């Protein structure tokens, strides 16, 4: 919920009487971030739970990883996930604004109004040209409807087979978000529909590499539990938790825009003369921060 004060949107809650009564789509899953002292208290509480009380396989693995500082890795299931990929890989991500009131034709209250996407193409394992294979689209203006231009940029940067299917695999984290936005754009622009849906139909979710997908791993040993666990995950698999485990040098901490909410607040304050997050003072600075984040 946002309030508008002194020409700038903020994260403060609006008054109850200003809330819309329209039925809103299911919100995206939010990560629970605990203060350091609360996390430490939780850790102490975990140690007080007797192993004899734990019957669930997931809980036993989590406790073992916590007690012994080890990692749980199901190599068989993870290998199977990789075998489903077809190159090139399109690392794809959207940013959207859940606007309370529809901004443009075809949108709904609290629907995701997309304003940015990033695409990084991995031609073969580890092969990605820094200039040619990296593309970011970011709306130039807040009040202009640039969705058609965005949709055209998407289909122009993916490759297709002669039969119209996607050449390769679209890759993302919690891919249902990206697939939903592609479907919405396909409904808006029938001339782009076939290619947008072709992208949707050949996708792989990084979440299923580390967490689980019972349907995908049906018939395999341990099909009902996660594929990877580390004590620092604390039960969650958001990219903000998993990325630092594998590439410690990459982190969202300290970024001018470091999460989805900050991203759309920077976007809707494009032309504000008030500082955003006490750092971003100009539109150019906000745009650059959004590009780095996405």
Please provide the spans of the model-predicted regions.
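Acidic, Mg2+-coordinating catalytic module of metal-dependent nucleases/exonucleases
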Residues: 1-23, 36, 230, 234, ...
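Secondary-structure capping and boundary motifs in well-ordered enzyme cores
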Residues: 83-84, 88, 109-111, 146, ...
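Conserved DEDDh/DEDDy metal-dependent 3′-5′ exonuclease domain
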Residues: 133-264
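Short amphipathic alpha-helical surface micro-motifs
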Residues: 71-75, 97-102, 187-191, 222
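Residues that form generic nucleotide/phosphate-binding pockets
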Residues: 48, 64-66, 81, 153, ...
